[in-house]
Every structure is written in C-alpha cells, then in structure tokens.
Amino acid sequence: MYTDTRQWTLVINSGQATRIRLICFPQAGAAAEQLRVWSNSLADHIELVVINLPGHGPRRDEAPYDNWPSLLQNTFAALDPWLGEPHALFGHGLGALLAYETCKYAQERFPRQTRHLFVSGCRSPDSLPRRPLLHSLPIEAFREAILTLGASPLEMPRGQSDLQSYERLLRNGLKLFETWYDTSSGSLDIPLTAFYGSEDPLATAKHMLNWREFTGREFELIEVAGNHFFIKSQRQRLLQVINTHLGLLAEHRI
C-alpha cells in the first residue's frame, strides 16, 4: 500500500536541535492549522508535528474516512517516517483515540521510541459513550448539542453550504468517536497523562480515570477548568504540563 504523506502533516520547529517530537491529533472537525499556535509555547527542543486528516484544512476536497480500519492503516503509513525517533503523542477527543491507537502501533513497530502519551477530553477505551449518540441526532438537535458542549457560534461557518459541509465532517468524526471501543487494558508500557474539562459532559473524571488501566507505567489525571473545548481556553495549562514532561525527558538524554 502506498500513502502520499505530503499533506498529512504540519511540521514546525524552532530551528534548534530537535530532541523529541510532539505528534498531535486534533479533535473531530478540526484541521492541523488550529494547533499551529502551540509552537509558540513549546520548548525549543520540541518539534511539533500535527496530523491533517482527509476532509480537513488543505485536504477539504478529499473524502473523510468513515471506518476505523482504513483510518488507522493510512494514518500509521503516513506517520512511519516520524515514529522511528523519540516522540510523544497528544490527542483531543477523536484525536486522543487516534493517539492511543498510534501509541499501540508504535510500541510494537518502533520499540522504546514513544516516550509519553497525552490524552485529552476523551473517555477511556472501555467506557461507553453517553446517550443519545451525537452523530445520530437530527440536524437541529445536532447543532444545539455542539453548542451546548461549548462550541462558539462565532467559529461556525456562516454560509449555508459551508455550514452543511462542516456539519457532515463533524458528524462523521463523532461517529468514529462514538462507535470506538477497546478492552485491551494494560497494553501500553508508556507513561500516560489524561486531561479533562471540569464542565465536559463527554469526558468526566470517571470516564478519564479508567485510562489508568491501559498502561503499566505512571498515570496522571489532570482537571482543567472549562467545557469540551478547553483545548483552546486552557492551552497554556496543557502546554505547561507537556513542556515539563518532555523537558524532563530531554534532561535524561533521550
């Protein structure tokens, strides 16, 4: 299988020597460009690599994946060039599930290269999604539910055609998010940090706490103020934690 990786990643570094990469997976409906600002606050030794899935950003004309096997197969193929060197993984919402699956893949394919997994705003692999399932809601109920989670009306597309395209993309991502399930507890040998929003109904403390069952290494659960979109409002808090962990790794000569 051949995967053209040229548009899969947004890569930003400080120009200084890279000691570790932070590979990020945005939430459902979000393009890689939305995490570009992270590079301004990351330590100079960390190279930022953000995944851009089909249907998002510069790939908006491509059909998004609607099933997990194809999504994972092509994501892994695109990331192979980056996974063979020291890296950490971060994902929010749907992105956290992709980060977790990539972590399992990299642990087998590139042993000892994944140094940390950060999951954010995402239920543990063995937790069932809350009902009703968002991706199956009628259009008006779907729009209301997204706004209730904390999405800003100002950030929603204004034109009717663009709004409908965005909603299809978001609904597709939420379907992947809500139909995924995994019971392979203890499968990781990698430190894991889990972030959750104090007012996020999609990923409560109970949902997030069970992530501890999926690693045999250190586990850290961190509450941050905000709703499901705390990845924006609490960006500096997240990056403070990430910089601390990846800074300690650099001090120990990765």
Q: Over which residues does each language-model region extend?
A:
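Domain-scale detector for complete catalytic domains at protein termini or as standalone homologs
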Residues: 1-90, 97-254
